[in-house]
């Protein structure tokens, strides 16, 4: 049903006293009021909700400051001698006791003037009826006895603080009172201990202007201060129970009777309204009285539904709740909440905000005399009445067909902490599992991180296994070495034992020989007979060794004839020898260049312009390679190839060509360091090098003599003849040996053939060089020299023909051996090529072209991206993902992250786990962290705080008895005796006892509940 807020009826009671009011107090029977101000002290009767002034206590008195009313208080007793007593406090520090029965000047009974400054508050003792308590600006509290006029101040309290703003006796304990101070503290005093305060609470930031004890709850007091707050305190523990924020400073507060947590307040400035608050709902007041035109100064509850107030606007008002402004009725009721399914429910009142046509009467028309009494603008009208309809509740869910579930941060943290893994599986499995966990809660950016880690570091497990295998092999090798050492040591011990046994046997034999009576001459004869055949064998071996040495010396003499002849003629032809040395050095350099060019051409890479790729050429086949085992390398004309026959090309080194080159090198190494010589047919000679040598000779031959040249030519002819004779002998011997051992020495035969052919070519080159040199010399020398040169030419031609004939005979004899050796060599190379290429098929027999790119990619460094990724997670506050990535990758590599940063990451994550009470997960992270600071944190900072099982207060170390309840905290719940040693307790209820007693109770007797009878189930239910 639609309901309308009705306007307030004319039910207010007010009284204009003509002067600003400062305080108000009620009689014990609530029929009269005492109102005090700067210029008035009057008694007002309250009958039928109407105010009437019955007496003026200041009538006919002089304008003395003793009679000004800064505060007033009616005696709370109903006894005849006390119910008419009234006390007032003046601004000059005087305290006046009034008797309302008397009239005129006799109404003043006592005047106390011990305070030096203004008295702010008065309070009668609830039990000692003749005593009154005062608080002053002079920083003292005084207890007065109204019966003693000479020395009335019986007790003086010196709190050593600032000015006292308010004092009140505790209704539950008459000997205690509370005082409010300007320094923001509230102190609890006992009149029996006037030297020191019992309790002190710092309640406000600034002045504490008012306090009020709760009428029902013990030790609970409310305070209001200049910091615009109302606070509720419990003096038993000094804790703040509630806090109400207002818009201005609070000058007076008063608990509402009949309503436990309702309290009224008024302000000293700005706010002229009186508010009634519910301290459990501190944001909006329940009721507000808006009739005063100036700040209220006093509050008295006449009943739970009516409030009497005075103000500096000189008015005394009786406020009824039915006339009050109710903010809750003028605001829209709204409720909002979440459920477990992430659904949002809200409820709102449907309000019709259309204005009603009826205009509301103003308060000035209702109370003309009230508003005409002072020049105050008329108050604004109340908010317009609004038609309220029935509330509407709406339920919203973020889960639609095309939307995703929204997860709370707390839920995500707990979900990841419980489901993430960092050990027990391989790297790829851990990444897959963590990716699935993050994807199940729609955290796609985190799942992408795990997938990237798996994509780049997919081979970490294989690398780790390889390292472990290497470590195992090293360990096994060390064990073998140790075992060998042990085995070597054992035979030494055995040898020592055997030697000792032999010595013992020899001693026994000597003893036995002495006992024998046979002659000793027979024994040397027998020994001589045994030694004769051994001497014959030694003599034969010595003869064979001498014959071999003689043959070896003869061969050396034949080979060193050239060098001896050259040394004999060295003193006569130093210049020519130097020329020959320079020629030899040039020729050796040419040989090196040609050999290098050949290697580059045959083993290097050739650019193929058709496909812009590099083709790696196959190593030369076995038919083009011959192994010479007898090549000594002493001849300077061996292994010379013409530079014109080779066209050097720029080669790009590739990994595949290098691997093939290594494979061919391995083949040559396996053949006992055999020199490789490459045969080439129809190669033109390099005339450039020869021409350069000829030019050098022409420059230097002018200084030489013709006789020296003739001697040199004759020496060379003799040396060549001796060389050829030696070669024929060596080759014939080799042929005979090859016929005997064809199957074992095929490789050496082929190499010998290659050597013979190379020497033929070298001899031809030497003859040509001699011819050229002789022709040049003919131009500069005499006719005698010409004849000598012609003779040399003829001799050279004859020698060449002899060499060719000898070599042809040798080649004819070795054709069969050569064919067999080549076939065997092909088989060996084919097998090794198959092993090197990992059983790959060859498309071509002569050469295999492999496509290789012209450039190589550098290895991509993924580690800086990982560090940036971790830093981005830290900036988002996701320390959890960073910790798990470090735990997983840290086992395989060094992440190059600063140690103190890792310590802060792990420390933050462990602290979060401990806040969520995930103790086991926090300890697991500590255990497997590589940082020693984190790993040993549980060992250094593990503390156990015990609490009393009866009151719950913590017990200090090395103490058994609780300080609060004075009970032994370690009593057994079954035997009720103190426990010394092992203590077992339930973490739910805190009860425990001896280990044996707990076992007998829960295991033997099969009990589930606590033995103390606290109804707690200490053991889980069994399914």
Curated annotation (Swiss-Prot):
Compositional bias per record (Low complexity), positions renumbered to this chain: 563-578, 682-695, 760-812
Kindly list any coiled-coil regions of this protein. Answer: none
Listed under catalytic activity are: S-ubiquitinyl-[E2 ubiquitin-conjugating enzyme]-L-cysteine + [acceptor protein]-L-lysine = [E2 ubiquitin-conjugating enzyme]-L-cysteine + N(6)-ubiquitinyl-[acceptor protein]-L-lysine
Q: Where do Polar residues bias regions lie? A: 661-681
Superkingdom of origin organism: Eukaryota
Task: Describe where the WD repeats fall, as residue ranges on this chain.
Answer: 16-54, 64-108, 114-154, 159-199, 203-243, 245-287, 291-329
Cellular component terms, GO, for this chain's entry? Answer: cytosol; GATOR2 complex; lysosomal membrane; vacuolar membrane
From the UniProt entry, list the residue stretches annotated as the region Disordered. 563-621, 661-824
SMART domains xref list: WD40
Stretches of Acidic residues bias are at: 584-593, 743-759
Provide the binding site for Zn(2+) 2. Answer: 972, 975, 994, 997
Per its UniProt record, what InterPro entries does this chain match?
Answer: G-protein_beta_WD-40_rep, WD40/YVTN_repeat-like_dom_sf, WD40_repeat_CS, WD40_repeat_dom_sf, WD40_rpt, WDR24, WDR59_RTC1-like_RING_Znf
Annotated pathway, please?
Protein modification; protein ubiquitination
State what protein this is by name: GATOR2 complex protein WDR24
* Organism, scientific name: Dictyostelium discoideum (Social amoeba)
